[in-house]
Amino acid sequence: MIISTWSRPRWTRRWPGSEYPPMSEPPRRRYDYVSDAAEIYRRSFATIRAEADLSALAADAQVVAVRMIHATGQVGLPAEMAFHPRLVTTARDALRAGAPIFTDAQMIASGITRRRLPAENAVHCLLHDERTPGLAYRWGTTRSAAAVSLWGSELEGAVVAIGNAPTALFHLLELIADGGPRPSAIIGIPVGFIGSAESKVALVENPWDLPYLVVHGRRGGSALCVAAVNALAQEAEI
């Protein structure tokens, strides 16, 4: 009979790098690469401007598109974008006036650069609110959609950024159709295979002429949504 003598190791928690003294010098340079942050940004945005076809977009929309391309590395993205003619001006005016930002994902809320926001705008994501799971269960929907119902009256005039759940975008449009508060602008870039493309079409065709930004099809996600919000929050491209 074989008797195992293995026991679970006892890991000692250490702060990262605590076993090594702080480095006084960087490691020896072995590769040829650009390390200056400002130069990386400058070259990146110049490359995007050179390679992407932005000709179909207005000048203010181009700034937003460049930021979104920078977040994804996909220079063909503008072909899939649709900007309402008033999206950029309306969203920026709302943010300057102190409008809150509502989003469907905590990753988006965390990614929004607070120092870019022009009026210390509040950023809300209620996905993890204690009321959300119960609402989702009773209504037979996703937690992302249920959380939208908790946005309440503050939604009036707000900027909405939906980057994960098509159900959240559909639910928002249904709330508005029932006479609920209307945001000033909607960034609708939910990602996915089920309902994503359809929810964006519904937003573009909204009967209230609400300003929108979408990336048609299945493409979307937190990185794209965050890039759009950060670009709208600050007019400078870099």
What are these regions (language model features)?
Residues M1-P22:
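C-terminal catalytic histidine-bearing segment of alpha/beta-hydrolase fold enzymes
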Residues R14, D104, I187-G188, A228:
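Buried hydrophobic positions in well-ordered alpha/beta secondary-structure cores of metabolic enzymes
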Residues M23-A59:
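Charged, compositionally biased N-terminal leader segments and the immediate start
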Residues A56-H70:
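N-terminal glycine-rich anion-binding loops that anchor highly charged ligand groups
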Residues A79-A94:
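A short, well-structured juxtamembrane/interface segment
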Residues A105-I176, S184, P190-G192, K200:
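Conserved mixed alpha/beta catalytic, RNA-binding, or beta-rich assembly cores of soluble enzyme
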Residues I194-I238:
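C-terminal functional extensions of proteins
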